[in-house]
From Swiss-Prot:
Origin species: Neovison vison (American mink)
SUBUNIT field: Interacts with PRLR.
Localization, UniProt: Secreted
Protein name, entry field: Prolactin
Name of the coding gene: PRL
Signal peptide: 1-30
GO cellular component: extracellular space
Similarity comment: family membership: Belongs to the somatotropin/prolactin family.
Pfam families recorded: Hormone_1
Gene Ontology biological process terms, A to Z: female pregnancy; lactation; positive regulation of cell population proliferation; positive regulation of lactation; positive regulation of receptor signaling pathway via JAK-STAT; response to nutrient levels
Any one Gene Ontology molecular-function term assigned to this protein's record: hormone activity
Function: Prolactin acts primarily on the mammary gland by promoting lactation.
Disulfide topology: 34-41, 88-204, 221-229
C-alpha cells in the first residue's frame, strides 16, 4: 500500500470524528446495544432508528468516497460505467428505485428488504477487504474505508434486527439474501477485467447504501412519526 490519495489523516478523519461524536451522543459507540449480561435491556424504537439512520448515512458517505477515489485512480478512460449498469449481485432483490416506489411498499416488507440487502453484502465486503490488501499501489484510504464499511455494515444489520424485533415481536424473518459469486473476478490475472470487477462492486455498494439510507429515513418517518415529517 502507498500513501497517495486521501488518508485517515486527510478528508476521512473529520467525517470519522463527526460520526463518532454523533454515535457517542446517541450512545451507540458499540453493538450489541445492551451491555453484556444486561437483563430486560430495552432501547426505544426511536433511538434504534436514530442510530440506524446515522450509521446508514455514514456507510453511504464512505462508499461514495471510496468509489470516487477508485474511479479517479483506476477507471479513467476504461468505459467501466457503461458495463456496470444493472450488473449488481443484489439485482435479484426487487428494490424500489425511488421514494415514490418505496412509499408504496408496506413497512414490514421494506424492513425485511433492508435486512436482505445488508446480509447480501456480508460476504463481498469481507472479500473486498482481503483483496484490496493485495492490490499493488492501492492507497491506504481505500483499504481503511473498506474495513470501516465492513464493520459498520455488521453493526447496522444487528441494529436492524433489533428494530424488526420491536416492530414485529416474535416474528422470525427467514435469512434470505442474494448470494455473491464475484470473488474469482476480483482475482483475475487480466488487469482490465480485475479492475472492472472492483469498480462494479464499489459501484453497487454505493448504489445499495444509498437505497438503504433512503429507505431508513422513510421508515423512520412512517413508523416513529406516523408519517408526520
Amino acid at each position: 500500500m502507498d500513501n497517495k490519495g486521501w488518508s485517515l489523516k486527510g478528508s476521512l478523519l473529520p467525517l470519522l470524528l463527526l460520526v463518532s461524536d454523533l454515535l457517542l451522543c446517541q450512545g451507540v459507540t458499540s453493538l450489541p446495544i445492551c451491555p453484556t449480561g444486561a437483563v430486560n435491556c430495552q432501547v426505544s424504537l426511536r433511538d434504534l432508528f436514530d442510530r440506524a439512520v446515522i450509521l446508514s448515512h455514514y456507510i453511504h458517505n464512505l462508499s461514495s468516497e471510496m468509489f470516487n477515489e477508485f474511479d479517479k485512480r483506476y477507471a479513467q478512460g476504461r468505459g467501466f460505467i457503461t458495463k456496470a449498469i444493472n450488473s449488481c449481485h443484489t439485482s435479484s432483490l426487487s428494490t424500489p428505485e425511488d421514494k415514490e416506489q418505496a412509499q408504496q411498499i408496506h413497512h414490514e416488507d421494506l424492513l425485511n428488504l433492508i435486512l436482505r440487502v445488508l446480509r447480501s453484502w456480508n460476504d463481498p465486503l469481507y472479500h473486498l477487504v482481503s483483496e484490496v490488501r493485495g492490490m499493488q499501489e492501492a492507497p491506504d484510504s481505500i483499504l481503511s474505508r473498506a474495513i470501516e464499511i465492513e464493520e459498520q455494515n455488521r453493526r447496522l444489520l444487528e441494529g436492524m434486527e433489533k428494530i424488526v424485533g420491536q416492530v414485529h415481536p416474535g416474528v422470525r424473518e427467514n435469512e434470505v439474501y442474494s448470494v455473491w459469486s464475484g470473488l474469482p473476478s476480483l482475482q483475475m490475472a487480466d488487469e482490465d477485467s480485475r479492475l472492472f470487477a472492483f469498480y462494479n462492486l464499489l459501484h453497487c455498494l454505493r448504489r445499495d447504501s444509498h437505497k438503504i439510507d433512503n429507505y431508513l429515513k422513510l421508515l423512520k418517518c412512517r413508523i416513529v412519526y406516523d408519517s408526520n415529517c
